[in-house]
Each structure stands twice: as C-alpha cells, then as structure tokens.
Amino acid sequence: MTRPVRTRFAPSPTGFIHLGNIRSALYPWAFARKMKGTFVLRIEDTDVERSSQEAVDAILDGMQWLGLDFDEGPIYQMQRMDRYREVIAQMLEKGLAYPCYMSAEELDALRERQREAGLKPRYDGTWRPEPGKVLPEPPAGVKPVLRFRNPLTGTVVWDDAVKGRVEISNEELDDLVIARPDGTPIYNFCVVVDDMDMGITHVIRGDDHVNNTPRQINILNALGGEPPVYAHLPTVLNEQGEKMSKRHGAMSVMAYRDAGFLPEAVVNYLARLGWSHGDAEIFSREQFVEWFDLEHLGKSPAQYDHSKLSWLNAHYIKEADNARLAELAKPFLAALGIDDAAIATGPALEAVVGLMKDRATTVKEIAEGATMFYRVPAPEADALAQHVTDVVRPALADLVAALKAADWTKEAVSAALKATLGTHKLKMPQLAMPVRLLVAGTTHTPSIDAVLVLFGRDVVVSRIEAALA
C-alpha cells in the first residue's frame, strides 16, 4: 500500500469509555504517529436514543488526558446524513441496493422456520430483484428498508494484521439492511462511506467487529473504494476473565485520573496490553511510537492486571517532577480538607511530595500521606498510652534539648536521635514511634529524620514539649 497512512478511532458515544475502548484509540494513534500519517477521530452517533454529549465529552477528555491528539475531527456521523443519503441514492440507481418490504414479524417467522429446518437464520432475498423474477406487490402504506445486493457467489478475503488470512463465503452473508424505513442509514453502511471518504488506510479495532468486516468490504468494493488493512484486536478481559465492560465493573478512563494514576503510566500499561517489544516493560511514549508495529500485536485476549498498573504507576511517580506532582496532589488535598491557605502554613508542598512519593502508588496516596504536615495532630488516646510511656519521657526531653541545639539538617537530626537512643539504652522504634505520634499524629510516616526536618524545628519542639508538660 503506497497511500499515506490514515487511521481512525471511531467510538460510539453511548456510555463511558474504559481501558478496553481507549486501547482501540492508542494503537491507531501510535501507528499514525510512527508512519508520519494522519489520525482521525470519528464519533459514530447514529444511535440517537443512546448517544449523548456527556459520552462524547468523556471520550474527548479521556483522549486529551492520555495525550492521544487527533489530526482531524471530531467528525460526527449525524452531520454526514446528506452524504449517506446521496450514496444510497446512487446505489439504488445502479441496482446495488433495493427496497425490501418484509416486516419484522415476517422476518422473525422466516428465521424460526429456518432454525427448525436446521438452517442458518438469514434473509432469503424475497424482495431482491433478479432477471425474470416477479416481485411481490408492495404492501400499501408500508415504508421499506433498503438492502445491499450482496454478491451471491465468491469469497470475501482479507489478510488481517492480527488474525492472518480470513475467508468468508458470500453464501454465508445475506443482503444487509443499509437504511431503516425512515431513511436513516445504519452503522455498517455509514462506516464504509466514512472510511472511503476519509481515505482510511488501516482499520485497527476490536475483534467484535470481525463479523462486520466481510459485509463492509463487499459494500466498499461495490462503491469502487479500496479496502483498508484490517487489524482486529483480541478482547481485553477483566481480572475475573470476563470481557471488560461497565456491566462487569470496568472503571472509566477518567476514573483512573481521579484515583491518582499518571497518564504516562496508563499509556505504558495499555501499550503492553496486547502488543509487545521484546521484554520491554517500561518505556516512554516516544519509545512506544518508535517501536510500535502491527506485526507484534497479540493474537490472544489480554487480561487486565490492576496490580501491574499500580506497579507501573509507582515507577512513574518516583520519576515524576515534584512540582508537577504537587499540582496534581492539590485537588486530592482539597478533597481531604487541605486548601491552598492550609498548605501555605506548612512545609513546601514540593518537598513534602518529594518525601512521600517513594512510598506511594498513586497521587491520591501522596496526598493522604501529606495531610499530616498541614493539620494539627490528634493522636488517639490509646496510641499515646502505648507509646508515650514514663520510660520514654526522659528520652523525649533529652531529644528536645538536642534538637534545639542541632543544625536543622537530616544528618544532624539523625545524629540527635541516635545519641538519645544510646544515652537511654532504647531501640529506634521505642523513640521514633512516640515522636511520630506527637509531631505527625500517626505512627506511619517515612524516615523519621526526614519527616522532622520538613516539619521544622519550632513545630517539632513545641509539639513534643506540649506532650511533656
């Protein structure tokens, strides 16, 4: 194929978009970028009753968050109705399509008879014009559907980039309805016209569309178009081994952002969910684009693993710039009651984030850990009784004296802690736990010396002294 590469993502805006859906955007986006081609966003909104602007916004927001920029679009099918009707008129004129007056009840009865006879249920061509054939008289007042004249013989063949060579006999296909009685064109027809008009060269989509492909190829051939390269991606399964879907508990793409995942982690994870480059597990967006090809798309269903995504996210959090993480943490802090005014009263948020990120798997966890720096501690009475004992109080008093005199560095604070331990014959947990509790309000913190340095000398000394008073 010598045409410039043009790929597309063509979602239906009928619900939220999950990771399995957005993978069908990631791969054509990457292929277009790799081949210096064009990536088109098409919104297939012909299902008027189920489509919504809210769902469109979710698609756009998810793509923007993940950095899947498109070169053309969004193109809405509902805004192309005149073009579809124009093509239908041409097909009727050329005998490529015909009106069919068979009612839904008649079609159901036909299919039932076929099933009882052990045949594949299908339309039998009652209204299909043929030389010498006498058609029934059109029933009065009935608006027909329009059907495509599918070839009766021959085979539809395509070399799928994932599935290999696929051959479907035309005898297996009936005459597809391409327009409803009200004249509204249906999905399988609109897709063909769109792909032809938009010059799509590669269709990378889920394998739930495989059954549509031979019908679409036949229509495309009838219209004189050039079929694209097809790559049908195996299903994404959830952790229970079911097809990923909202009904089976899938999260929306934006729910991952709201849970504190970084977009680069999600992109990296999605890239590996059905494609591989050797043993590479962690790679940048730029590396992904450079390495991506259709030859290494997986042929088996890929199963979502939340722990693997969390592991990747933890890696990217550790690598992320502290200033960026601080900005990302602010909405989570706000949800926990820590606003900008509260942040201004405590240590620099960038420094806090830098301390917390090595222990976190999400930005939300960073924010949860950071709250101790911006709240007055309120340790539970049971915890105080357990850790701030009469044995420890003299050591706490000596530690305060040492901290007042020490340089306020991590090394100096660490030395003061160790000296106090030596003097009072204590082990680190015996001293660190009560100090954490009194200063931070919790016994769960990163390294105690680093935490104390961030709180600042005045806060540390005053909080321990208040407990000893």
Curated annotation (Swiss-Prot):
What EC numbers are recorded for this enzyme? Answer: 6.1.1.17
Q: Which GO terms describe its cellular component?
A: cytosol
Keyword terms, alphabetized: Aminoacyl-tRNA synthetase, ATP-binding, Cytoplasm, Ligase, Nucleotide-binding, Protein biosynthesis
Residue span of motif 'HIGH' region: 11-21
Query: EC top class, in one word?
Result: ligase
One family name in Pfam for this protein: tRNA-synt_1c
Catalytic activity field: tRNA(Glu) + L-glutamate + ATP = L-glutamyl-tRNA(Glu) + AMP + diphosphate
Where's it found, cell-wise?
Answer: Cytoplasm
Matches recorded under PROSITE patterns: AA_TRNA_LIGASE_I
Q: Find motif ('KMSKS' region) and give its ranges.
A: 243-247
Q: Which HAMAP family match?
A: Glu_tRNA_synth_type1
Q: How does it assemble?
A: Monomer.
* Biological role stated in the UniProt entry: Catalyzes the attachment of glutamate to tRNA(Glu) in a two-step reaction: glutamate is first activated by ATP to form Glu-AMP and then transferred to the acceptor end of tRNA(Glu).
Tell me what this protein is called.
Answer: Glutamate--tRNA ligase
| Organism in which the protein naturally occurs | Burkholderia lata (strain ATCC 17760 / DSM 23089 / LMG 22485 / NCIMB 9086 / R18194 / 383)
